[in-house]
UniProtKB/Swiss-Prot annotation:
Tissue expression remark: Expressed in capsules, buds and stems, and at lower levels in leaves. Localized to parenchyma cells within the vascular bundle, but only to those cells distal to laticifers. In roots, found in the pericycle within the stele.
Protein name as it appears in the record: (R,S)-reticuline 7-O-methyltransferase
BP GO annotations: alkaloid biosynthetic process; methylation
Record flagged with keyword Transmembrane helix: no
Subunit structure as annotated in this protein's UniProt entry: Homodimer.
Record's catalysed reaction(s): (S)-reticuline + S-adenosyl-L-methionine = (S)-laudanine + S-adenosyl-L-homocysteine + H(+); (R)-reticuline + S-adenosyl-L-methionine = (R)-laudanine + S-adenosyl-L-homocysteine + H(+)
Alphabetical list of CDD domains matching this protein: AdoMet_MTases (cd02440)
Organism ancestry: Eukaryota, Viridiplantae, Streptophyta, Embryophyta, Tracheophyta
Active site as annotated: H259
GO terms assigned for molecular function: (R,S)-reticuline 7-O-methyltransferase activity; identical protein binding; O-methyltransferase activity; protein dimerization activity
UniProt key word Iron-sulfur: no
Species: Papaver somniferum (Opium poppy)
Functional note: Catalyzes the transfer of a methyl group to reticuline to form laudanine. Methylates the simple catechols guaiacol and isovanillic acid as well as the tetrahydrobenzylisoquinolines (R)-reticuline, (S)-reticuline, (R,S)-orientaline, (R)-protosinomenine and (R,S)-isoorientaline. Involved in the production of laudanine.
Temperature dependence comment: Optimum temperature is 37 degrees Celsius.
Keyword list, A-Z: Alkaloid metabolism, Methyltransferase, S-adenosyl-L-methionine, Transferase
Amino acid sequence: MDTAEERLKGQAEIWEHMFAFVDSMALKCAVELGIPDIINSHGRPVTISEIVDSLKTNTPSSSPNIDYLTRIMRLLVHKRLFTSELHQESNQLLYNLTRSSKWLLKDSKFNLSPLVLWETNPILLKPWQYLGKCAQEKSSPFERAHGCEIWDLALADPKFNNFLNGAMQCSTTTIINEMLLEYKDGFSGIAGSLVDVGGGTGSIIAEIVKAHPHIQGINFDLPHVVATAAEFPGVKHVGGDMFVDIPEADAVIMKWILHDWSDEDCTIILKNCYRAIRKKKNGKVIIVDCVLRPDGNDLFDKMGLIFDVLMMAHTTAGKERTEAEWKILLNNAGFPRYNVIRTPAFPCIIEAFPE
């Protein structure tokens, strides 16, 4: 029988889960107001009054609510996004950055702010209201919420398309360093060309080519996506459809692409990858994606489980996969040999080789 203490712990855990969205909204508030940047610009811990003064300077017409800001900062300090320390002389709290909030600085190369604003945007939040219904009826929460798939919305709405591209580019910068380090020999061994399938605006292939100038980079995505891409040295932008044809290359790379699609769709994409590299002596496909370990305790194992449910809300049939599921998927598409390379960052690198 549960003790009174156990029952209270259980109750507290449900309360915490129930209101977990408050953490996300407080985080969004801090990003929207640029609070990490305000603290960073001072070069020292700041008071709430100094934060308010900076907000007034940035937006002269604003009238910041100091009570709200103080309470929001109190929660974010508790969540370790900021620190606070009482200044003895002034008897005011001084706020400073932590290792977490340093990832929210807009001028930093490693800035997760666009992704925070993406995931907390009403368009992305609305599908979650349909998760239970869709679990009963086997339908798509995003289509229920918006009447179309996320890719169709991006095609129809240029503003949303740019928003999506910015978030995806942001996700790239968080992992590129670890990827270049952990797969250095793999990139060095590519004889000539590398096509980034679903490469968005080309930021990841640009970084790979910059680190390995012998590689001829091809950024491949839908025409309306590459139309907004900047020019990068050694990178050619190509518009097309990965479900129809993929440009020939010595190797193919896909970052967080296959988790957006069903096994059937992934098989089509992978077979097109097979055709793209089949004439090459050492052709291979490099998949940067999650490899689920449901019982794992590493830094990002829990995030894999979260992303798996995230795919339900954002895509029609996307999902994260265990190594056993990857093995079946790759084998069915003509890739019987593969290696899983775990990195310190969230996704793994899967090297797949044709027969």
